[in-house]
Amino acid sequence: QKGISFRGIYKEKMGYSYTEKIDETSIELLVVEAMENAESIEMDDKEELYAGAQHYETVNQYSEAVTNISPQELIKVAFSMENIALQVHPFVKRVIQCSAVKSEGERSIANTKGLHCTSKYTNVSAGIYLMANDGTQTATGYESDFTWKDFVAIDSKEIAEKAAREALSKLG
């Protein structure tokens, strides 16, 4: 998801706006909306723009390895989780949702006081939501995992088995 968040002081009030549409026409709309929002604020509390700190810790949330994960690898992991879950016990009847997803992006924060910070990030996650039925009762189980850097750290077998055990534990 990409977007731009904007805030500014107008008539001594802080106005906010946001858009996911990033083009030339959005700039004026962001400013106008922030001004309108500032005018509608009824509180008298003053807000200030943060000038920034002298030093920021480096946070590394980017992994080239995650960037290079292919869609085929993600699909393979999702199908594997589904198959494992369905083999845990005969009462596990259906996988409702199963996914393996990667994302990457960049964040920037800047203001008129000189603050300008940018960082890139990647992450990958896998999860499964399933249903078990013992003939009289139905229960669901869910499990997922997430990592910033190492897809290998996600144990798809463990995720599938935990979700199945959760559903089974809710039966009878």
PLM regions and their residue ranges:
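Active-site bordering "gate/hinge" segments
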Residues: 1-172
